[in-house]
Amino acid sequence: TGNDLGGSLRTPAAFNGVVGLRPSPGRVPRGTRLPSTDTLWVEGPMARNVDDLALMLDAGVGHQVDDPLSFDHSGPSFVKVLKQVETPKRVAFSPDLSVVSMEKEIAEVCRSAIRVFKDIGTEVTDEIPDFDGVLGAFQTLRAVLFAIMMEPILEQHRDMIAPEIVG
């Protein structure tokens, strides 16, 4: 397992041919090292494949008394649900979400992969939400979180910390 604030589980997984999942806040308890009100930073699994990831998620979910955002998992096992998944009727696709730049060749590989969805009868749309301002909002929220967590370090060594971290 690991944690994810802005892609720390998902990005390395994507680069290494494994699966990383950022669960909903509170799904996997975080312990006490983070402010109890923070919902940006979550714990989650990384695994070789989706089946293993579901198994890890089953093992990691649940309420933990020292994490007030955590909650009991009263639903069925993720492994069980995975075996009952139906073919999606509609999916949206965007190689870059209009947020990051992408090499043309990589975008083409991604576009060719969406044929799998079309071949199983899924409607594929390219509707992209308006993400204007999202990066700035994320960086502000991240700076506040880091300022809370690292107050003593910030007071003594602010000049040594990257500006995009401290805002």
State what each model feature region is.
Residues 40-42, 65-140:
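Gly/Ser-rich, acidic/histidine-flanked active-site/gating loops
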Residues 80-94, 143-167:
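Short helix-loop capping/hinge segments that flank enzyme active sites or metal/cofactor-binding pockets
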Residues 14-17, 138-143:
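Short low-complexity, flexible loop/linker segments enriched in glycine and/or proline
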Residues 23-26, 33, 51, 55-66, ...:
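Generic secondary-structure signature for well-ordered alpha-helical cores
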Residues 18, 47-51, 104-107, 111, ...:
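Electropositive phosphate-/nucleotide-binding environments in soluble metabolic enzymes
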Residues 1-64:
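Short glycine/serine-rich loop segments
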